[in-house]
Amino acid sequence: MKTTAAVLAAGLALTLAGAAQAQEFQPKAAGTKMLNVRVTSVDPEAGDPITTLAGAATGLRAEVNADVMPTIGLSYFFTDNVAVEVIAGTTKHTVTAKGPATDVKVKETWVLPPVVSLQYHFAPTAKVSPYVGAGVNYMIFYNGSDKNNFDLDIDNGFGFALQAGVDVAVSGPWSANVDVKKVFFETDATDNRNGVKSKVKLDPWVVSAGFGYKF
């Protein structure tokens, strides 16, 4: 959570600076496109039990570390208030099996988790413009590297996301942005070599801060 807190703090500083400096600015409106470039923390909330393929307890749980990445988001406003946003970026995570006397790396893997959200912007013509959204995501696990004699398969799949954020005008088409998403995603992780599996609820917090440009 330390990286998430750092990204959120940086984003709040950006938005406060933007609010203080904003003079003439371009408001949100129907037909507007917005490109957002952000620094994003992805912090999974894993910790589910690892069982044998027969369902017996092993006393271990699956943990997944956080990572920080650059992300790109593109929004299109259908009306002054309603927009759709697509974001993409990729992170690298380590899956670890943990127990009372165990702390073993199982796999390192890259994750591509694009999210498509439908948003409602409450004050499109204001300098400080908050919004909420909801959407779907698809988790793609790729370029994995197994560790310590494990052979782990992690299933790709769909999840859904809730979102809240704020855009603060800086100057002209430029704005500062803070965005928080909660992604709900569950997957199966199977170790083919050792005959164990885990149904892992990743459910990451996705916290971003950056700048947007309207065109």
Regions found by a protein language model. Give the residues of each.
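Gram-negative bacterial Sec-dependent N-terminal signal peptides
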Residues: 1-22
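Outer-membrane beta-barrel biogenesis signature
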Residues: 15-51, 120
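Short coil turns and loop connectors of transmembrane beta-barrels in diderm outer membranes
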Residues: 18, 31, 80, 124-130, ...
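Gram-negative (and chloroplast) outer-membrane scaffold detector with strong preference
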Residues: 24, 36-43, 72-146, 204-215
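Outer-membrane beta-barrel translocator domains and adjoining extracellular loop/strand segments
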Residues: 47-54, 95-103, 142-151, 188-195
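Predominantly the C-terminal beta-signal and adjacent terminal strand-loop region
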Residues: 48, 93-97, 171-215
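Aromatic- and Gly/Pro-rich amphipathic surface segment
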Residues: 55-73, 77-79
